[in-house]
């Protein structure tokens, strides 16, 4: 059937901010869907609150609303735009839940909007656990013994019926297993059941008999209107059931299924998608298989594009989201061409002749108090994927792609083996490092059978790991120079990196590389082509392996290589991927052939049509040098991917200089390209030189530059031991901020108020980076922090991209603080001082491209405000997408063109753009996933994502940002206030404003006394140890609608922490800073006076 002619305008919902369980795979799917629908001539309207997405760029959709994803505001977009159809399957669980809400409350009928991609009955049948089980029963597919409950009493009755613990609890209409878990006894069960009912938007949980130890598989399935069904990919979890699939190491295609078993799953999947009624698009279906008797049960189905669809798309080259969008508007699979082969139709199931491994990345170290144990609730913050010809190769490449300091599956550092008892405990309890515990167990001589008993990891995988250990033993007893060409090939085919070979043979990585090349052992690159080389592939999407024949095709244009950011982690996420994509778009447009190198399957940068060539490879020195030697680019861009490529800049430069041929120099595309002996272009690192980057990162060098320019910074010092630290702290006075040098995301950074706290920090933190000293700065209390993004060209011209004023005071990591652009309270003199220093510093560091500087301002409203510089980063920062959306200036695109030799004048960007509207960025924090952790903000970054609120008034913009971040601010009710002594007097005017807005106020004894002295009528509430009813009772009885609680030093921490955790559990907004409280007052006032309206980014920034 050709495309539908009866619809013209389609509304697409994004997934909002990046949260655990719902990350940038939905930017990838949404961007693909927008492109596909516009190609077909439809007008596309998009709603998404996340500014750090390619999807919200003004050119992706026709009309783009960066507005909170709530049913109320999406209804306003519908009323304004009058779309014919709503496509809800591209924005994860968020979009699906909003679509269901709008269908049920009659909005879609009122405005005559049709749901496409998945109809309401299909969504409900797949998502409502009771309906799903009934549907499976009807078609004879087994489900796990289970029941659905909406109350604690119903839950207990089901537990009695099932009869045995452990039991699995899964809330309906949630993603990433939010609110779920495994209960091993009745007490745990009752607690988890209540949490699960509260977490589900429909207050419903499914209670399953535990299938712990069963094998888990997923099939990615597509169906069209003509009832054609294709299986795109099978995925096998190495970890058994009981661990969320997002936290499990997974392999595609499934490795341990016999053909007969695979056909069984395939037949079931086809029956399921037909019965549920997903007519047009993709679904992800999860199965459990009993390894003892082969029993199969279906676990669940997602009637939408999911995290696994992004992985399947990257693993096979089949663009699921794009195809799903086309199916949603009436095409059938046989009518759509495969983009990669250009010959085969989409109804041909992909075939692959390689193995793909995905490994999750965790961030437990960011959440002290949370246990690093994996369950059915997803906790990973990112993932890396690798492709190899064999499982061993793909597995080792994936582990080194994670960037956690490992070069593969061990054999990369001296290890002290744990005891047998410790290893058994690590194997029994699923945790992020269990795969390395398997290695230790095999090294201690534990049999694969015993490891299987403890882990339920399939013996096939354990056998492969045993083989890897044999290779390692062989390497350790063979001197490097005695390895023959065949042996070197065999070792590399097992995925061993040069660094691992160097460790085993007691040599260096560079020696291994030189000897390997001498033997003529270099990687070749194979194509991901959807058809196992049956047809010619037209899209250069490559992975490395060690065989004879390469499939890299020569190019006629000069090539530029962009190094991506690798797996998402806290501190380095989608914002950097956004910059890499923009570099690819801009340089492609300028006539270069762009090469993207990245290992993250969730992102737009690893879409096969973002760059001209895609290398799905680990971002290590070895892998990147191999690609440089295969492609000979004229330029390499390292300043867009965060810390990952920056760390590679100096090693790449050093190696290429040593090798002779002088084949790497620093510079920009504006010089003449020299030709070396063998007529290949010289490869240059484009943009700011690695030396300048180092002089901004290296504290001592940076301080000299600031002294030369007469720029003030807070009193500070450097310590390499606890004794050093004490001397520095005494000299500059407490409180101080302590942190290791060279970190991103404020890793291991703290504010310290005393000698004892300093001692505790030094004992813990020096282990973080032993070769780098600890930096100690005077902590500027109550300072306003300011972030500046600027851009500079090779002529020395500097233009400010945007000046953002933080809403939380200095001391809270800039990635976790809300901020406003333009500034809302800083006087012109302060802003001008900031501008002057930014320009001077960019010129002194010879910045070419982007730069981010953080300042602190003390006494902004006094007669003599003081400005201090906190740090400077001559690279793209995580605020670039936000600034670009707020001002309408595509900074990353401009910066990449500047690196190619263009000037700001040529690009027509010569002065700062100050918007007439207000944009507020707010951070989104994952505390609900880490129940043991305090919700307090500090200098270590913990947010996973961000949202943007945009309006003509600060109060409304802040209200939208809070709403987008999932905080519904109350308009009436009671505010609970408990302040540290430092903040009590500053709280008086804020509390007065809350009373003026009609709120009642409750406070603890000390805070109340100060408020009463200032003539404010405040009710007393008891602290926990003062008797009942206390503040926690008031929260649980829903007598409090808003909590303002600023943390004090060490004392009373337990009380305050419990108050904050309880507030979080009861979904009460919690504010932990005075500045945040002031912004909240402005937001509530504006919402009491006016309703929130919606407007497109194209209207806010018409010149974008």
Swiss-Prot record:
* Superkingdom classification of source: Bacteria
State its cofactor. Mg(2+); Mn(2+)
Q: Which residues bind Mg(2+) 2?
A: 300, 302
Q: What PROSITE patterns does this protein's entry cite? A: ATP_GRASP, CPSASE_1, CPSASE_2, MGS
Give a single Pfam family match: CPSase_L_D3
Where does the record place the ATP-grasp domain?
133-329, 703-900
Give the binding site residues for ATP 2.
739, 778, 780, 785, 811-814, 854, 871
Where does this protein act, in terms of pathway?
Answer: Amino-acid biosynthesis; L-arginine biosynthesis; carbamoyl phosphate from bicarbonate: step 1/1; Pyrimidine metabolism; UMP biosynthesis via de novo pathway; (S)-dihydroorotate from bicarbonate: step 1/3
Q: Where is this region: Carbamoyl phosphate synthetic domain?
A: 553-966
Region annotation (Oligomerization domain) maps to 404-552
Q: Name one GO biological process term.
A: 'de novo' UMP biosynthetic process
Residue span of region Allosteric domain: 967-1104
TM segments?
none
Residues holding Mg(2+) 1: 286, 300
Q: Which residues bind Mn(2+) 3?
A: 854, 871
Q: Which residues bind Mn(2+) 2?
A: 300, 302
Instruction: List ligand-binding residues for Mg(2+) 4.
Output: 871, 873
Residues annotated as region Carboxyphosphate synthetic domain? Answer: 1-403
Can you tell me which residues bind ATP 1? 129, 170, 176-177, 209, 211, 216, 242-244, 286, 300
What sort of enzyme, by top EC class, is this?
ligase
Could you give the domain comment from the record? The large subunit is composed of 2 ATP-grasp domains that are involved in binding the 2 ATP molecules needed for carbamoyl phosphate synthesis. The N-terminal ATP-grasp domain (referred to as the carboxyphosphate synthetic component) catalyzes the ATP-dependent phosphorylation of hydrogencarbonate to carboxyphosphate and the subsequent nucleophilic attack by ammonia to form a carbamate intermediate.
Sequence similarity: Belongs to the CarB family.
General function of this protein: Large subunit of the glutamine-dependent carbamoyl phosphate synthetase (CPSase). CPSase catalyzes the formation of carbamoyl phosphate from the ammonia moiety of glutamine, carbonate, and phosphate donated by ATP, constituting the first step of 2 biosynthetic pathways, one leading to arginine and/or urea and the other to pyrimidine nucleotides.
How this chain assembles, per its entry, is:
Composed of two chains; the small (or glutamine) chain promotes the hydrolysis of glutamine to ammonia, which is used by the large (or ammonia) chain to synthesize carbamoyl phosphate. Tetramer of heterodimers (alpha,beta)4.
Name of the protein in its database record: Carbamoyl phosphate synthase large chain
Q: Which organism is it from?
A: Nostoc sp. (strain PCC 7120 / SAG 25.82 / UTEX 2576)
Taxonomy-wise, where does this protein's organism fall, top ranks first?
Bacteria, Bacillati, Cyanobacteriota, Cyanophyceae, Nostocales
């Amino acid at each position: 059937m050709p495309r539908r002619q009866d619809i013209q305008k389609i509304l697409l919902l994004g997934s909002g901010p990046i949260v655990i369980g719902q990350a940038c795979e939905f930017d990838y799917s949404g961007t693909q869907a927008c492109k596909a629908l516009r190609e077909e001539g439809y007008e596309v309207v998009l709603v998404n609150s996340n500014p750090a997405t390619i999807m919200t760029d003004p050119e992706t959709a026709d009309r783009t609303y960066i507005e909170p994803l709530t049913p109320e505001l999406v209804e306003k977009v519908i009323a304004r735009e009058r779309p014919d159809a709503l496509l809800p399957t591209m924005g994860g669980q968020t979009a699906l839940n909003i679509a269901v809400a709008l269908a049920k409350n009659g909005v879609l009928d009122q405005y005559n909007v049709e749901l496409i991609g998945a109809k309401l009955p299909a969504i409900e049948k797949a998502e409502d656990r009771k309906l799903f089980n009934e549907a499976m029963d009807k078609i004879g597919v087994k489900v796990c013994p289970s029941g659905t409950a909406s109350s604690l009493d119903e839950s207990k009755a089901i537990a009695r019926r099932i009869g045995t613990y452990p039991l699995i609890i899964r809330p309906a209409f949630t993603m990433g297993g939010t609110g779920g878990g495994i209960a091993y006894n009745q007490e745990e069960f009752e607690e988890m059941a209540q949490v699960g009912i509260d977490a589900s938007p429909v207050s419903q949980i499914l209670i399953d008999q535990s299938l712990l130890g069963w094998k888990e598989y997923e099939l990615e399935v597509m169906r069209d209107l003509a009832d054609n069904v294709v299986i795109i990919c099978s995925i096998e979890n190495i970890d058994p059931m009981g661990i969320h699939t997002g936290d499990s190491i997974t392999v595609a295609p499934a490795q341990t299924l016999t053909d007969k078993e695979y056909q069984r799953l395939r037949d079931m999947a086809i029956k399921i998608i037909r019965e549920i009624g997903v007519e047009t698009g993709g679904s992800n279906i999860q199965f459990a298989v009993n390894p003892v008797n082969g029993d199969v049960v279906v676990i669940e189905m997602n009637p939408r594009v999911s995290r696994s669809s992004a992985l399947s798309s990257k693993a096979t080259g089949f663009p699921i989201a794009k195809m799903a969008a086309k199916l949603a508007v009436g095409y059938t699979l046989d009518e759509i061409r495969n983009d990669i082969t250009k010959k085969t139709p989409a109804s041909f199931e992909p075939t692959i002749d390689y193995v793909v491994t995905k490994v999750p990345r965790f961030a437990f170290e960011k959440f002290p108090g949370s246990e690093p144990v994996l369950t059915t609730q997803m906790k990973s913050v990112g993932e890396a994927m690798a492709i190899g010809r064999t499982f061993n190769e793909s597995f080792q490449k994936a582990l080194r792609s994670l960037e956690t300091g490992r070069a593969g599956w061990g054999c990369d550092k001296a290890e002290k083996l744990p005891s047998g008892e410790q290893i058994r405990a690590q194997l029994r309890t699923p945790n992020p490092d269990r795969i390395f515990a398997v290695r230790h167990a095999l090294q201690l001589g534990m049999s694969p059978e015993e490891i299987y008993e403890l882990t339920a990891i399939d013996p096939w995988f354990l056998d492969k790991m045993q083989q890897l250990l044999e290779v390692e033993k062989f390497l350790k007893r063979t001197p490097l120079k005695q390895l023959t060409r065949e042996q070197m090939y065999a070792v590399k085919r097992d995925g061993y990196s040069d660094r691992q070979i160097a460790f085993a043979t007691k040599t260096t990585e560079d020696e291994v590389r030189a000897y390997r090349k001498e033997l003529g052992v270099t990687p070749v690159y194979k194509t991901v082509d959807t058809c196992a080389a049956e047809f010619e592939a037209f899209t250069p999407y490559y992975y490395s392996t060690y065989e004879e024949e390469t499939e890299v095709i020569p190019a006629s244009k000069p090539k530029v290589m962009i190094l991506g950011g690798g797996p998402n982690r806290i501190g380095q996420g989608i914002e950097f991927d956004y910059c890499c994509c923009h570099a690819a778009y801009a340089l492609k447009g300028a006539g270069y052939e762009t090469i993207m190198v990245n290992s993250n399957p969730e992102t737009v940068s690893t879409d096969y049509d973002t760059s001209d060539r895609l290398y799905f490879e680990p971002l290590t020195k070895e892998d990147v040098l191999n690609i440089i030697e295969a492609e000979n680019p004229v330029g390499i861009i390292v300043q867009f991917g965060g810390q990952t490529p920056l760390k590679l800049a100096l090693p790449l430069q050093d190696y290429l200089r040593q090798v002779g041929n002088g084949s790497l120099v620093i510079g920009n595309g504006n010089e003449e390209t020299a030709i070396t002996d063998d007529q290949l272009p010289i490869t240059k690192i484009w943009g700011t030189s690695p030396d300048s980057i180092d002089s901004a990162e290296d504290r001592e060098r940076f301080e000299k530059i600031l002294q030369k320019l007469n720029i003030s910074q807070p009193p500070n010092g450097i310590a390499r031991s606890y004794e050093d630290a004490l001397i520095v702290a005494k000299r500059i006075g407490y409180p101080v901020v302590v942190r290791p040098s060279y970190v991103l995301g404020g890793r291991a950074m703290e504010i310290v108020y005393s000698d004892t706290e300093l001692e505790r920090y030094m004992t813990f933190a020096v282990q973080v980076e032993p070769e780098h000293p600890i930096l100690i700065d005077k902590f500027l209390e109550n300072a306003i922090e300011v972030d500046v993004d600027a851009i500079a060209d090779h002529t020395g011209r500097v233009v400010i991209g945007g000046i953002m004023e933080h809403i939380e005071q200095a001391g809270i990591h800039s990635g976790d603080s809300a901020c406003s652009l333009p500034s809302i309270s800083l006087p012109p003199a302060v802003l001008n001082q900031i501008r002057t220093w930014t320009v001077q510093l960019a010129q002194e560091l010879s910045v070419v491209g982007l730069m981010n500087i953080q300042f602190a301002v003390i006494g902004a409203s006094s007669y003599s405000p003081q400005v201090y510089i906190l740090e400077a980063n001559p690279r793209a920062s995580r605020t670039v997408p936000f600034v670009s959306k707020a001002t309408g200036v595509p900074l990353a695109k401009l910066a990449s063109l500047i690196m190619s030799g263009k000037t700001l004048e040529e690009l027509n960007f010569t002065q700062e753009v100050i918007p007439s509207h207000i944009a507020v960025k707010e951070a989104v924090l994952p505390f609900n996933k880490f129940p043991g952790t305090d919700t307090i903000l500090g200098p270590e970054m913990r947010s996973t994502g961000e949202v943007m609120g945009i309006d003509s008034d600060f109060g409304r913009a802040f209200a939208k940002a809070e709403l987008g971040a999932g905080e519904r601010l109350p308009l009436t009710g009671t505010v609970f206030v408990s302040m540290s002594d430092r903040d009590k007097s500053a709280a008086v005017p804020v509390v007065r404003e809350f009373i003026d807005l009609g709120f009642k106020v409750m406070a603890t004894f000390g805070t109340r006394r100060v408020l009463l002295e200032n003539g404010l009528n405040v009710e007393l509430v008891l602290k926990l140890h003062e008797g009942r009813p206390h503040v926690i009772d008031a929260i649980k009885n829903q007598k409090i609608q808003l909590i303002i609680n600023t943390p004090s030093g060490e004392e009373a921490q337990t009380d305050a922490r419990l108050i904050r955790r309880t507030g979080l559990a009861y979904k009460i907004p919690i504010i932990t800073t005075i500045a945040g409280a002031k912004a909240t007052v402005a937001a509530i006032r504006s919402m009491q006076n006016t309703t929130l309206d919606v407007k497109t980014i194209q209207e806010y920034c018409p010149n974008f």
